[in-house]
Amino acid sequence: MSVDISVIIPLYNKGEFIERTLKSVAVQDISNWECIIVDDGSTDASVEIVKEFIRVNPGNWKLISQKNSGQTSARNHGVRLAQGTYLAFLDADDLWPSNKLRLQFGALESDRSAVLVLSAFAIFRDHNTTARVVRHRDPLKMNKRWLLMSGFGGGLESVGMVRRGVLLDDELFDSALSTSSGLDLSLRLAELGKVILLAEIGLYYRINAGQWHADTNELGRNLDILCERYQNRFSQNLARSHSAYLFWVSARGYGTRYLVVSFVRSLFTLRNGRLSILVNLIWRNIASSRLGKSKRSETVSAISKLDR
């Protein structure tokens, strides 16, 4: 059976969440997809949960196992097995609204010059509390500079869909970047063709204890690599994006430690650190927004239906 979309889910010790994640794929309102789950040597009940889900919910599911090599390796493994024209990635603890694949598939099908589509996403904590929706206010003005400034491409792992034909075997997710491989791939794709940004929410992004965000030093190391890699390839000063990204992460509630580290880092790595922080923080607030009461209730309700 031919498929248009390959969904790739790297899995490592997400037994608490993986069934809900798979359920959000199963309820997509189009059926032209396959789902490849790549287990990265889980030591909990994740694999057994996936097998039972597939037994009860027959469909185009594939469970692959590999020796523990990291999420990036698992994603790349899935890409190499994929049969679809398009690739969509989903982390094993995140959720998709039911129209995610249809909207992104339609966007790429209607514009053959586009290589990547990204959607807005809602951030939520356990207990279904939505913190913010991150979106661009004018999708028609999406370009490479905005992608770079905003760091939005860091969400490719769950929020994007890419045209598989533009990826080469040696240019997939970079295994040297444990926390920013999605942003790196987005930046490379932005050099190859058009990037579409949809205003509709395409991801419910879960914040929970134990995420990589807890390792500020590793995040900083990854972004240092990206600064060196891209500073001469884009007109926008990537150092500012680097600093602003760390600051933005802290502002999203990932912890006081982020706030202190990113602020100090900004002051000492930029010539005009305070101004850069102010300008980029204003930019971030333009690019994202808190939900109004009715929309918040609607989004929380949608998450609640999936996250149980």
Model-derived segments and spans:
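N-proximal low-complexity "stem/linker" segments adjacent to membrane-targeting elements
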Residues: 1-26
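Cell-envelope/extracellular polymer assembly enzymes that use nucleotide-activated donors
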Residues: 3-6, 34, 184
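Conserved nucleotide-sugar donor-binding catalytic segment
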Residues: 80, 119, 138-223
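Short aromatic/hydrophobic "clamp" motif used to bind/position activated sugar donors
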Residues: 87
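A conserved acidic beta->alpha catalytic loop
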Residues: 24, 31, 39-49, 69, ...
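C-terminal subregions of glycosyltransferases and related glycan-biosynthesis enzymes
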Residues: 191, 204-308
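Glycine-rich, basic loop-to-helix element that forms the pyrophosphate-binding segment
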Residues: 66-82, 103
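Conserved donor NDP-sugar-binding/catalytic core segment of glycosyltransferases
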Residues: 99-131
